[in-house]
Amino acid sequence: MFAVVRVRGPVNVSGKIEDTLGMLRLHKVNHCVFLQDTPNNKGMIQKSKDYIAYGTVDVESLTEVLSKRGRLEGDARLTDEYVKENSEFASIASFAEALVNDDAKITDVPLLKPVFRLHPPRKGHAGIKRTAQQGGVLGNHGDDIKALLNKMR
């Protein structure tokens, strides 16, 4: 499962890339989505790699984002009680584990919003014009996406 965070804004973005970001539901900066590892998603990520940060997410990071930033329709917080009452999962942690193992989808919890609005990163980004390999924040972070998600908790 991939965590994808939009890092750059809408100015001077080509129409095709803006459409791709719209299909990924990344309409605003600091928004995050979690995507399954499919060829379609990989292609959209590759196309918009100059405007997003992405990487493979682990269970702990996903649990933290779901519990702190997960919202239901009506802007109510996602809680363990809601997950237990309205889905087959016992808690947010078990739901996150099932998501990482591709045994579940975000839509398995009813009314859960698929976009997570993150806080701007504490101490700022390393640079939004350079890739992660060049010392910036754009592109593929691999397993190190958890550090970015922790900064934006």
From Swiss-Prot:
**Top-rank taxon, per record:** Archaea
Q: Supply the source organism for this entry.
A: Methanococcoides burtonii (strain DSM 6242 / NBRC 107633 / OCM 468 / ACE-M)
Which Pfam family name is an example for this entry?
A: Ribosomal_L30
Tell me the NCBIfam families matching this sequence: PRK06049.1, uL30_arch
This protein's GO CC annotations: cytosolic large ribosomal subunit
Assembly and interactions? Part of the 50S ribosomal subunit.
Tell me, what is an example of a GO biological process annotation in this record? maturation of LSU-rRNA from tricistronic rRNA transcript (SSU-rRNA, 5.8S rRNA, LSU-rRNA)
Q: What Gene3D superfamilies does the database record attribute to this sequence?
A: 1.10.15.30, Ribosomal protein L30, ferredoxin-like fold domain (3.30.1390.20)
Q: Which spans of this chain does the record mark as coiled coil?
A: none
Q: What keywords tag this UniProt record?
A: Ribonucleoprotein, Ribosomal protein
Which protein family is named in the record?
Answer: Belongs to the universal ribosomal protein uL30 family.
Q: Which GO terms describe its molecular function?
A: RNA binding; structural constituent of ribosome
* The protein's name in its UniProt record: Large ribosomal subunit protein uL30
The record's listing under InterPro entries reads:
Ribo_uL30_ferredoxin-like_sf, Ribosomal_uL30, Ribosomal_uL30_arc, Ribosomal_uL30_euk_arc, Ribosomal_uL30_ferredoxin-like
The record ties this protein, via HAMAP family, to: Ribosomal_uL30_A
Where are the bilayer-spanning segments? none
